[in-house]
């Protein structure tokens, strides 16, 4: 992504999945299974799931993945998933995040934590996340936009990725780990 091509560039919020798995293991040292609820039509979720499974395989952790098509599928899928795993981990799946309260309610029923993929999910009830700074990402994006507006060739600008991530913990949910 050093030179994406015709008038194309941007920024990326790639998840640090290795750090996320390390966080889950630190908070739940005995974790044996992690549930993933994802939307089958979101390419980002499919890619994250593949990478997450590879990391968990190395750690001896089973990933139980449940695909949904839309919001109407989430209540039953979240309930079923929560009944089978030690915790649930969210990606930046738009459909799932927009229905986070449903996932949290299912997890509450089985007294398991939900880990988020960014700080806002933790604010909304997830136990913890290794989160990138979306304000910093926005600033980098804005700086790139200014460069394009000043005449720089967007197609020659590499895509920039924010890689610094910070653990964020919801102290009111800490007992759930």
Regions found by a protein language model. Name each.
Residues 1, 103-127:
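Venus flytrap/periplasmic-binding-protein-like
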Residues 2-33, 132-152:
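Hydrophobic alpha-helical segments within soluble ligand-binding/sensing domains
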Residues 7-8, 55-71:
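Short beta-strand elements in bilobed, periplasmic/extracellular small-molecule ligand-binding domains
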Residues 10-56, 158-173:
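An alpha-beta-alpha
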Residues 34-37, 85-97, 115-117:
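Periplasmic-binding protein-like
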Residues 67-81:
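Structural motif
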Residues 120-172:
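Flexible loop/turn connectors
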Residues 177:
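Conserved small/polar residues in nucleotide/adenosyl-binding loops
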């Amino acid at each position: 992504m050093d030179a994406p091509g015709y008038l194309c560039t941007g920024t990326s919020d790639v998840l640090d999945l290795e750090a996320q798995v390390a966080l889950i293991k630190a908070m739940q040292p005995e974790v044996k299974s992690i549930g993933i609820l994802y939307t089958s039509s979101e390419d980002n979720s499919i890619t994250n799931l593949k990478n997450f499974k590879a990391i968990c395989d190395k750690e001896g952790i089973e990933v139980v993945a449940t695909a949904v098509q839309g919001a109407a599928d989430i209540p039953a899928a979240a309930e079923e998933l929560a009944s089978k795993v030690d915790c649930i981990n969210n990606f930046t799946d738009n459909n799932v995040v927009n229905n986070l309260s449903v996932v949290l309610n299912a997890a509450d029923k089985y007294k398991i934590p939900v880990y988020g993929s960014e700080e806002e999910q933790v604010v909304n009830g997830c136990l913890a996340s290794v989160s990138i700074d979306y304000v910093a990402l926005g600033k980098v994006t804005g700086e790139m936009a200014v460069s394009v507006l000043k005449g720089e060739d967007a197609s020659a600008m590499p895509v920039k990725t924010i890689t610094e991530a910070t653990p964020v913990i919801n102290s009111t949910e800490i007992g759930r780990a």
